[in-house]
């Protein structure tokens, strides 16, 4: 069984630095997808949960206002602001939404394939959870 990160924001390991530059490890585990997503100012993404999928997201530039709560929980979702250079994690069965107040580009790595029929068979839409 995988051990999930204990917090939404994932602490990054130390980078490898020398005179050539830097290598920053992000995610080192078995997964089936990696996608690059650009979101425009005012966009809202997600408002769903995944039954089996999980994903890590790394913000290249911009900022994500990330809302999350366990599936079925009717309390207000928790809000986390994810900034440029930060990595965050969403496990299965967590309702989540992403709000973009500025143009943002981020990379997502997931457990499952992002082929549309595979993705849609595991994603469950929920009413908007962002305020």
Question: What is each model feature region?
Answer:
Residues 35, 44-45, 62-68, 87:
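Short beta-strand segments in beta-sandwich/barrel cores
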Residues 52-71:
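Glycine- and acidic-residue-biased ligand/ion/polar-headgroup-sensing regions
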Residues 5, 11, 72-74, 97-131:
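Double-stranded beta-helix
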Residues 70-92:
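Short acidic-glycine-tyrosine-enriched beta hairpin
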Residues 23, 47, 66-67, 90, ...:
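Short beta-strand His + acidic residue motifs that chelate non-heme Fe in jelly-roll/DSBH
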Residues 48, 54-59, 80, 88, ...:
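His/acidic/aromatic-lined binding-pocket segments of jelly-roll/cupin-type domains
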Residues 1-33:
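A short, N-terminal "cap"/entry segment at the start of jelly-roll beta-barrel domains
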Residues 35-53:
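Conserved short histidine dyad/triad with adjacent acidic residue
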């Amino acid at each position: 069984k995988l051990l999930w990160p204990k917090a939404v924001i994932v602490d990054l390991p130390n980078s490898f630095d020398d005179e050539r530059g830097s290598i920053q490890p992000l995610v080192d585990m078995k997964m089936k997808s990696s996608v690059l997503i650009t979101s425009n100012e005012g966009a809202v993404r997600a408002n769903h949960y995944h039954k089996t999928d999980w994903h890590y997201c790394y913000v290249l530039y911009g900022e994500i206002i990330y809302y999350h709560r366990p599936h079925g929980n009717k309390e207000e979702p928790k809000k986390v602001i994810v900034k440029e250079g930060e990595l965050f994690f969403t496990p299965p069965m967590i309702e989540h939404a992403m709000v973009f107040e500025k143009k943002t580009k981020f990379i997502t790595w997931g457990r499952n394939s992002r082929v549309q029929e595979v993705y849609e068979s595991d994603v469950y839409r929920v009413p908007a959870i962002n305020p």
